[in-house]
Amino acid sequence: MKYAIITGASSGFGKAIASELQNMGYGLVLFARRIDRLQELQKKLTKSDVYIAALDVRDEAAVQKCISDLPVHISANIFALINNAGLAVGRGPLDQGLSDDWNRMIDTNVKGLLYMSHAVIPLLEKHPFSHVINLSSIAGKEVYAGGNVYCASKHAVDAISKALRIDLLEKQIKVCNIAPGAAETEFSIVRFKGDAQTATKVYEGFEPLQAEDIAQTIAFILSRPAHVSIADITIMPSAQANGSLFNRK
């Protein structure tokens, strides 16, 4: 059985990706900070072999331990790494920002992705045409008002994806960068620190992406033949033109 590692798997994109890959016949390695949610998800994913572990990707030693602790039958059959864990915290001018928020975003979105990729790539090397899929953002393609550090972190993901594609070319590992636009998940609740009213307004007047849209995109990427590599995908709602312009009704 082929296995896929998914970070940030307890909700949003990660949860939907797990469900979609189960339907493709993948075994699943699911990492997230909230083990209770992973346990609930594991009970629902009855079609596949599902391995779960609590993990904060900001902790390099914990990342290394989680990968080294994988059972042999799983570690020998890792065919995909999906670096999904990420977040935005706060939105406003840089001079009004909080360094704790900056560190949380950089440590999760950038350093966490690096730690996980560094630990898992040696497992992917065993399987030609395996995948690293990085969840970036439209914020990794452009910047918007109040996005400063979050946009910077996702620009870093975009750059790391391009660099990995060079680094892993001779190892025959495919690297894809996915840049979603506005998607209705817990993202805005986290960004606005639990302010549900402000978070809801983000999606008013148009139909945003759903987590399932991203999961289906990843299923398409993984299902391409060996000679086809999807390098970069920007996916937005039909009502979105760029990082900040929407056709709201």
Describe each model-derived feature in a short phrase:
Residues 10-11:
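Conserved glycine-rich cofactor-binding loop
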Residues 117, 153:
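Active-site helix of classical SDR
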Residues 26-40:
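Conserved glycine-rich Rossmann-like NAD(P)H-binding loop of the short-chain dehydrogenase/reductase
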